[in-house]
């Protein structure tokens, strides 16, 4: 009984379909790991199993559109209430409030992961593990989808379960060091 397993797939679409199934059904049902505790990693942003493609597939499967669920387009991405997102720039001046208390502070940092709790007009409210931040439209470039993130962005983070999409990355990224 090992908690590590390797699944070979012939092409990137088969790999993406398998990753979606692992997150949506197999790991939650067989290992009791909820989808929100599974992090998908990829060595690259582009290509079939890059984070851009994986994030679109995972959002469609794990957080599809629904009536009453707020959405906000930014560039090529549609942010949706319930999405997992990552702060991708240090912002020492952003105000956060601790959920359920009157505590507040300043600063969110590159690599912080949260969940969009609400989208009200142009404002997106994100919960970073109890620290709630409101993003105005001019701040949305500080957020990226985080259902899947690059191995580089995940360095130093801990997750209950990790799925590594290592199929079609650039040769210099497809090394043992990526697993480390």
Predicted regions, residues:
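Conserved helicase motor core of P-loop NTPases
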Residues: 1-106
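C-terminal accessory regions
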Residues: 110-180
